[in-house]
Structure formats: C-alpha cells, structure tokens
C-alpha cells in the first residue's frame, strides 16, 4: 500500500540515524553540511600512500611514475614526484601551493585545492569553511539537481541539468562521497577539465578513492592509481613546511 510505504519512509527519516536519501537537499550548503555530519566523528585524520601516476600521451603512449603522498586533514598535502632525491613535488598548506623542480621552489602562491577539499577536508573541518571555499572558487551553491552517474544517484551542485560546462561538483547520494568535478581551464576557456574519483574503498572508518581520472574536453589525459594506503599516520609537521622540502621525506611506513 502506498500509504504504508509513505509511513515507513517517514519513520526512517525521523529515526536517530537519518539517511541522506531521506533528506531533501535544498542547496549546496545543505549538502556540504550533510557530508560533514555523516562522517565528522569517524573520518581519518591523515593518510599516506603511493600511487602510479600515469600520463597518457596524444600519440597513444603512456608514462608511469611512482609518487608518494601524505595528507593531513584539513588542508595539508605533500607530494613527491618520483624519488625524493630528485627534489620534485608539491606542498599544499594553509591555502597555498609551492612547486618544486629539482629541489628549487616556485611559490608559494594562493591555491585552494578543491579535490582535497571535496574528497577529504569536507569531513574534517567546519562546514562553514568548506562552504566559503566552494563559494570563493566560483561554485554556485544555489544550483542543485539530481542525476544518474554510473548507476548511482548523485547530487550535482553548481549547474543546471544538462549543463556540463559550468563549474560543478558531483556527490554520490547514498554514501555522500565526492565523485566528479567539472571546470573550465583557468587560462583557456575552450578547455573543460573533468576529474573523476573512482573505486572507493574502505579505509579505517572512512573511504578513499583508489583511482582518480583526469579528462580534458572528454579525453583521458592522466590517471592516478593508489596503493599501500594507510590511515591515521603520524607525520613530522616539517613535512608540510615548504622551506624544509629538501630535508624531509614521506615515510610510507609512518606509524599509525
């Protein structure tokens, strides 16, 4: 009976553990808040992992490097591209980005890493901070609708239905996990970048996307495949200090 189904859903939505799919997301602010509230007491504080970084060239060839990454949430990410001895990588910290090439630094410059924000930080920082970051990066949080994405229901924030050019992010409805970001290139509006978080796996009491795919104008140009993932690793604070990049190393055997 329809009325019985309705009462069942009402009862579920009034229970202590209210599932997101029983809530009507009125806008992006409500969604970002729900993401935080779902995992605020369980999401890991840090993670260390290795990745196969795969560049897909226009001629059909590819190049693979092994990178080391360390995240401390919210807002800190250290990447070593290749062996630490080569001095190549990035440090994202305190809203800035410093790039290293053969040990020489460029930056820091202001930078909000929205993949870090939406894939990780959102669960470990105040919702108001995430909302301010998203607005500051040009996402229209008043725009929200639902889509089907690879067989799953998703929320799309920042664009109207059918618009795949405006800046937008996609969130899986069931688990409230980030799955896609679409945005124009900062320097060339004819290029549309599309980043996809795939292959979510349990990590401690949270989740991590073990594969990240990058597309430009529909063509897959770069992929990241994560392995040796460890949650709640303990890091030396100097690891995220750009001035000490060349004297610190990411320890894949960091204590948990």
Describe the residue ranges of each PLM region:
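Residue-level detector of beta-strand face positions
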Residues: 48-54, 80, 98, 146, ...
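Gly/Pro-enriched, hydrophobic low-complexity segments
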Residues: 83-86, 150-246
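A short, sequence-level motif marking secondary-structure junctions
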Residues: 69-73, 93-96, 112-116, 172-174, ...
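Positively charged n-region of N-terminal signal peptides that target proteins for export
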Residues: 1-4
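N-terminal mature ectodomain segment of secretory-pathway/periplasmic proteins
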Residues: 27-105, 140-142
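Flexible, processing/modification-adjacent segments and terminal tails
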Residues: 23-33, 43, 96-165, 185-191, ...
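Bacterial N-terminal signal peptides
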Residues: 6-16
């Amino acid at each position: 009976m329809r009325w019985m189904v309705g009462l069942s859903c009402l009862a579920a939505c009034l229970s202590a553990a209210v599932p997101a799919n029983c809530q009507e997301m009125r806008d992006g602010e409500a969604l970002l808040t729900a993401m935080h509230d779902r995992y605020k007491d369980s999401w890991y504080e840090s993670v260390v992992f290795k990745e196969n970084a795969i560049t897909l060239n226009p001629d059909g060839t590819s190049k693979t490097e092994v990178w080391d990454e360390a995240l401390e949430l919210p807002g800190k990410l250290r990447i070593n591209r290749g062996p630490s001895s080569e001095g190549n990588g990035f440090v994202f910290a305190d809203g800035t980005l410093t790039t290293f090439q053969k040990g020489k630094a460029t930056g820091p410059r202001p930078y909000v890493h929205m993949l870090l924000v939406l894939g990780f930080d959102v669960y470990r920082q105040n919702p108001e901070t995430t909302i301010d970051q998203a607005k500051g990066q040009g996402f229209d949080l008043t725009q929200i609708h639902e889509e089907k994405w690879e067989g799953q229901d998703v929320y799309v924030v920042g664009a109207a239905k059918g618009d795949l050019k405006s800046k937008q992010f996609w969130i899986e409805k069931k688990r409230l996990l980030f799955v896609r970001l679409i945005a124009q290139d900062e320097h060339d509006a004819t290029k549309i970048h599309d980043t996809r978080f795939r292959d979510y796996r349990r990590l401690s009491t949270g989740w991590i996307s073990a594969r990240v795919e990058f597309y430009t104008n529909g063509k897959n140009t770069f992929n990241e495949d994560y392995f040796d993932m460890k949650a709640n690793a303990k890091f030396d604070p100097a690891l995220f200090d750009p001035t000490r990049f060349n004297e610190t190393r990411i320890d894949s055997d960091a204590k948990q």
